[in-house]
From Swiss-Prot:
Annotated GO CC locations: cytosol
Function: Phosphorylation of dTMP to form dTDP in both de novo and salvage pathways of dTTP synthesis.
Organism, scientific name: Symbiobacterium thermophilum (strain DSM 24528 / JCM 14929 / IAM 14863 / T)
Protein name: Thymidylate kinase
Catalysed reactions, semicolon-separated: dTMP + ATP = dTDP + ADP
CDD domains xrefs: TMPK (cd01672)
Name of encoding gene: tmk
GO BP terms: dTDP biosynthetic process; dTTP biosynthetic process; dUDP biosynthetic process
Keyword Nucleotide-binding: yes
Family under the similarity heading: Belongs to the thymidylate kinase family.
Residues binding ATP, per UniProt: 9-16
Family annotation (SUPFAM superfamilies): P-loop containing nucleoside triphosphate hydrolases
Enzyme Commission numbers on file: 2.7.4.9
GO molecular function, one term: dTMP kinase activity
């Protein structure tokens, strides 16, 4: 049985660190997995990523942004995610469709129905078995990123990122079985412990019960 797990959250919420620790844990447990990210995951999708995140493209319209994300996602799903799932692997993805619903929908103002439609076409209606949202106040997330060069989306206003946070929390309330919120303001070890527990809940039985040590 394959499992698809996505990670979401405001920029600076600690996704990269927590995913890295989770992958180390999966290695220790001999769980076959593929790690990938959005936008990106294939050569074509990575080219689209560069366009989307380039600060020089700050004038990009939200509809262009949404369509580019969907195009990258279509390529990503067909060439990376679905093949890995068909091989019975666990797929760990840094962002997926929920990012579009929240960033271009809730924060960007596009109709969620439109975003849902184009992304269902792009993915063949593929949905993660579990989505883990790392929740952190935007001002705290911004402070964590001091010294790092911000991309085009990260340079949006604090109000924009607050809408993103609220969008994720609303999503978790709407889909509580799939979307789980983890308080990312705590220590790295505490956050990782919760993530491992949530991941183990959806892993095939043969991979469960190996412990949740940080």
């Amino acid at each position: 049985m394959s499992v698809f797990i996505s990670f979401e959250g405001v920029d600076g919420s600690g996704k990269s660190t927590q995913i890295r620790l989770l992958l180390q844990y999966l290695d220790e447990q001999s769980v076959p997995y593929v790690f990938t990210r959005e936008p990106g995951g294939t050569p074509i999708a990575e080219q689209i990523r560069r366009v989307l995140l380039d600060p020089a493209n700050r004038g990009m319209s939200v509809i262009t942004e949404a369509l580019l994300f969907a195009a990258a996602r279509a390529e990503h799903v067909s060439r990376t995610i679905r093949p890995a799932l068909e091989e019975g692997k666990v797929v760990i993805c840094d962002r997926f469709v929920d990012s579009s619903l929240v960033y271009q929908g809730v924060a960007g103002g596009l109709p969620v129905e439109f975003l849902t439609q184009i992304n269902e076409m792009a993915t063949g209606a593929l949905r993660p078995h579990r989505t883990i949202v790392l929740d952190l106040a935007p001002e705290v997330a911004l402070a964590r990123r001091t010294g790092e060069e911000a991309d085009r989306i990260e340079r949006q206003s604090r109000e924009y990122h607050q809408l993103v946070r609220e969008g994720y929390l609303d999503l978790a309330r709407a889909e509580p079985r799939r979307v789980k919120v983890v308080d990312a303001s705590r220590s790295v070890e505490e956050v990782q412990k919760d993530i491992r527990r949530l991941v183990e809940e959806v892993l095939p039985r043969r991979f469960r019960g190996a412990g949740t040590r940080p």
